[in-house]
Amino acid sequence: MQVQNIEGTLTAQGIRFGLVVSRFNDFIGQKLVEGAIDCIVRHGGSADNITVIRCPGAFELPSVTRKAAMSGKFDAMITLGVIIRGSTPHFDVIAAEATKGIAQVGLETMIPITFGVLTTENLEQAIERAGTKAGNKGFDAALGAIEMVNLYKQLG
């Protein structure tokens, strides 16, 4: 008996991507978008198959992602944004609700949805994760989306 392994490949050719990005902390969010686009193109995807959708903030990411995912225009959704802790409990509420909501959209739509939303203690950590010391989490989220689309295809 031989164990069967099923894995997604890392080729983006022909995949239609929706990138949903929150505008709050946009100077960092834009770096995440650039990282995601770079990843898709490096893995054989076309800029013609990438749509960037901007929403006001992280709290709106789940509903906008759901609407876009249900449109039938996309094979994968990549959520991007930046939530930085402040001096009030607002961070905890927004981070938790955005995370839960985005996960729920993936389960409801059965379209691969990846989470590239930074949740950091401070601005420096966010900048580090948007293309400096800690890589680019937009790139990482796009890579996950590519793999998941191909995995879903194999699973039927």
Swiss-Prot record:
Keywords annotated in UniProt: Riboflavin biosynthesis, Transferase
Q: Which residues bind 5-amino-6-(D-ribitylamino)uracil?
A: 24, 58-60, 82-84, 115
Q: Which HAMAP family match?
A: Lumazine_synth (MF_00178)
The keyword Transferase belongs to this UniProt entry's keyword annotation:
yes
Q: Which protein is depicted?
A: 6,7-dimethyl-8-ribityllumazine synthase
UniProt-annotated binding residues for (2S)-2-hydroxy-3-oxobutyl phosphate: 87-88, 129
The entry's active site is 90
The organism that produces this protein has a lineage beginning with: Bacteria, Pseudomonadati, Chlorobiota, Chlorobiia, Chlorobiales
Q: In which pathway does it act?
A: Cofactor biosynthesis; riboflavin biosynthesis; riboflavin from 2-hydroxy-3-oxobutyl phosphate and 5-amino-6-(D-ribitylamino)uracil: step 1/2
Reaction equation(s) it catalyzes: (2S)-2-hydroxy-3-oxobutyl phosphate + 5-amino-6-(D-ribitylamino)uracil = 6,7-dimethyl-8-(1-D-ribityl)lumazine + phosphate + 2 H2O + H(+)
Organism, per UniProt?
Chlorobaculum parvum (strain DSM 263 / NCIMB 8327)
| Function summary | Catalyzes the formation of 6,7-dimethyl-8-ribityllumazine by condensation of 5-amino-6-(D-ribitylamino)uracil with 3,4-dihydroxy-2-butanone 4-phosphate. This is the penultimate step in the biosynthesis of riboflavin.
Corresponding gene? Answer: ribH
